[in-house]
C-alpha cells in the first residue's frame, strides 16, 4: 500500500515540478508560443489539453496489454485524434469565441508531443489510476506555465489580465509582446529563470 | 494466402476495432453538437449584420446564394441576406472573403436597399498582424466604408479618412491589409450587384 501511495505522489509531483512539461521536458512548445497572447485562450487551450491527455491516457492504459509494438504509435495517434476532435467540436459548440481565437491550434493538439510522450512513457506501461493522475498532473503543469506566460504577455501588451484593466491608464502597451517575438523573449527568460531555480535545488 | 490474411488480422484486429469505436464516438458527438455549431455561426453573422444595419433592420432572410469568383477558377459561396424592417427592405448584407496579409480575411458587408451605398463592414475572421493590420477592424479605417458609394473603391495612402467617398485612406504601416479589405469588397460587391440586377432583385438604376 505504501509503495502504491508513493508512486501516486511521485507521478503528481513529476508533472507539477520535477518533469514539468515546458521547463523540464521542453515539450509542447508550439502552442506555448502561439496561444499565449492573452490568458483566456491560454487557459482554454490548457483545459483542452488536460481533457485530451487524461482521455487518451485512459484509452491507452486500458489497451496497453493488447498493443503490438510496431503498431503502438498508430494506436496512440488514433486515440489522441479522436479526443482532440471531440474537444474541438465542444469548443465550437459551447465556446464559439474562444474557438475562433484559437483557430487551428485546437486541431493541432493532435501533434502536441506531450500527449504522445505521456502515452508512450506512462500510460502504455502503467495502470489506470497512475495514468489518470499522470494525465492530470502533466496537463496541470503545462497549463500553469502556459497561463503564467500568457499573463505576463497580456499584462505588458494590453495592460489587462482576463480582459480586465490592471495597469494604470498612463501605461503604454508594448505591442511587440502580443506578437511572436514577445512569446520567444518571455519564454526564453522564463526558461532561464526556471533553470537557475532548479540548479539551486539540487 | 489464408495464412497471410490470418496474420494480417492477428496484427491489426485491435486497430480495426479501435478505429470503428473511435469513429463511432466522433460520429455521435458530431451528431449531438452540430446543430449548435451551425446555430452559433448563424448567430454570429446575424449579430454582425444587426450591428451594421441597426436600428433600421428588424430581421434577416437568406434571399440568394451566389458563387463569387475570387481568382480564375476559384469560387467562394456567398449568402446574400435581405434586411427587413416594418415590412420593407432596409438593406442587404453578404459575406465576402479574400487573401489578407497573413491569412484569408472573411468579412460581412452591408449595403443599402438599392445597392447605392455601403453601410459598413465587419470582420468574421481575420489573422492580421496585431497592432498594425488588425486595425482594419477599428475606426478610423472602418468608418470610411459607412456611406461610401457601392462601386469601385480605391486605396490611397494620403488623404482625410473623414471624407466619405470612394477613396479609402490606408492605415499607415498596414497597406497590404488595407488594400486586402478594399479588394475583397470591390471583388464581391461588383459581382453581387450585377447578379442582383440580373435577377431583378434590385433596380437597374445603380
Which residues are covered by each model-predicted region?
Chain B
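Flexible, solvent-exposed loop/hinge segments and secondary-structure transition points
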Residues: 2-206
